[in-house]
Amino acid sequence: PKIRSQIIDAIDALAVLGRDLITTGPSLSGTWRMLWTTEKEQLYIIKNANWFGTQVGDVLQVIDVENLKLDNVITFPPSGVFFVRSSIEIASDQRVNFRFTSAVLRGKDWEIPLPPFGQGWFESVYLDDDIRVAKD
């Protein structure tokens, strides 16, 4: 809990320092690896990967600003993936709204389509060529 609080405080400090930055332009497009999150849904999936006899591999967000698409990808080595596609809307200089459009859980020889329900938003409070810090 103490480390979590320190990380959130650091993110909030970055948000204040970067409040005038534009982080929703073309430089937001790319494949971003998640290193830390407070997202309950992602944490639940990560925690319960052992249900499938595996552990979590990469957790990625693939953002395409030009085509207004967002893909959330959680890999389960050696051949599994949970994939959620979303449409996005640039709402402000730092805020992106998204709406889920499709979801699938895929293994080596099987695939389960899931209903894509939900929507949300995130604000990229810091962005450079290597690091993106977002909050929601």
List PLM regions with ranges.
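Soluble ligand-binding/transfer domains with enclosed cavities or grooves
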Residues: P1-D136
